[in-house]
C-alpha cells in the first residue's frame, strides 16, 4: 500500500512538472503571438488612416519588447504622418541605438530632416543609409534631390544615374535625370529621359507635363498638346496660361 502511494505521488509530481513546463511554453508562445497581433492591428489601423490606434498598438508592442527595432521604426513613421516631428526623430534614433546597421532608420531620418528644410543633416543621413546599403535606390534618389536643392546639378545627376544603374526601370530616376538636363538646357537629353520614364510608367503625369513643356520649346506643338492633355487626364493641374498658349495650335 505504501509502495503504491509512493508511486502515485511520484507520478503526480511528474505530471505537475510537465504541466508547469507546458504552461511556460504556452505563455511564451502567447506572448510572441500577441506581439504579432499588435503589429497586425497597428498595420491595419495605419492603412485605414487611424494613426492614433496605430501608435497605441506599437506602444503596446514596446511595453512587451522595449528593444523591438521594427516597432520603434514603424512608430516613428506613424508619428511622422501625424506631424509629430520630435517624436518621429526620437524613434528613428532609438532604432539606431538598438541596431546601428538598419539603413531605413537613417533614410527616414533624412526624409524627416528634409521636410524640415534641414538639408545638410538630411544629406548626412542619406549618406549613412548608403554606407550600409549602397544599392538603396530611394536613398540615391533623395540624395539627388538634396543636391538639386543645393543647386549642385552634377552631383544630383550622378545620384540619379546611380539609382537607374541599380534599377533601370526606375521611372522617377529617369524623370529626375530629365529635369537635370532641362536645367542644363540640354533639351534632347531631357526629352529622351522623360520619354523613358513614360515607357516605364505610361500615366506618369509629371513626365507628360515636362514633355509638353519641352515640346513647346521645340515648337512641336501637336506633341506638346498631346502630352499636356495626357498630363491633365493623369491627375495633374496644368497651368491655364500654358494651355492658353497652346490654343492656336489645336
Model features per residue range: what roles?
Residues 9-18:
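Bacterial N-terminal signal peptides
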Residues 20-34, 209, 213-250:
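Terminal, low-structured helical/coil segments at or just beyond the last alpha-helical repeat
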Residues 36-47, 70-81, 104-115, 138-148, ...:
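Conserved alpha-helical positions within TPR/SEL1-like repeat arrays
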Residues 47-60, 82-94, 104, 115-128, ...:
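Structural signature of tandem alpha-helical TPR/SEL1-like repeats
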Residues 64, 98, 132, 166, ...:
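Structural marker of alpha-solenoid helical repeat scaffolds
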Residues 103-104, 137-138, 171-172, 205-206, ...:
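Boundary/linker segments of alpha-helical solenoid repeat arrays
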Amino acid at each position: 500500500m505504501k509502495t503504491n502511494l509512493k508511486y502515485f505521488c511520484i507520478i503526480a509530481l511528474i505530471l505537475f512538472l510537465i504541466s508547469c513546463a507546458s504552461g511556460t511554453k504556452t505563455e511564451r508562445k502567447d506572448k510572441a503571438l500577441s506581439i504579432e497581433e499588435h503589429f497586425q492591428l497597428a498595420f491595419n489601423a495605419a492603412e485605414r488612416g487611424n494613426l492614433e490606434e496605430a501608435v497605441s498598438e506599437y506602444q503596446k508592442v514596446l511595453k512587451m519588447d522595449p528593444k523591438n527595432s521594427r516597432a520603434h521604426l514603424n512608430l516613428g513613421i506613424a508619428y511622422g504622418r501625424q506631424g509629430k516631428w520630435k517624436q518621429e526623430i526620437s524613434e528613428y534614433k532609438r532604432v539606431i541605438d538598438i541596431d546601428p546597421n538598419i539603413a531605413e532608420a537613417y533614410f527616414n531620418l533624412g526624409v524627416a530632416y528634409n521636410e524640415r528644410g534641414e538639408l545638410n543633416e538630411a544629406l548626412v543621413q542619406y549618406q549613412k543609409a548608403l554606407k550600409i546599403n549602397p544599392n538603396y535606390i530611394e536613398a540615391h534618389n533623395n540624395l539627388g534631390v538634396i543636391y538639386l536643392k543645393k543647386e549642385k546639378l552634377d552631383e544630383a545627376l550622378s545620384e540619379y544615374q546611380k539609382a537607374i544603374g541599380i534599377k533601370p526601370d526606375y521611372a522617377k530616376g529617369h524623370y529626375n535625370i530629365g529635369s537635370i538636363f532641362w536645367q542644363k538646357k540640354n533639351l534632347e537629353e531631357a526629352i529622351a529621359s522623360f520619354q523613358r520614364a513614360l515607357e516605364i510608367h505610361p500615366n506618369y503625369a509629371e513626365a507628360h507635363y515636362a514633355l509638353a513643356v519641352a515640346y513647346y520649346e521645340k515648337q512641336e506643338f501637336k506633341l506638346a498638346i498631346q502630352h499636356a492633355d495626357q498630363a491633365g487626364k493623369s491627375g495633374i493641374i496644368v497651368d491655364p496660361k500654358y494651355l492658353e498658349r497652346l490654343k492656336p495650335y489645336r
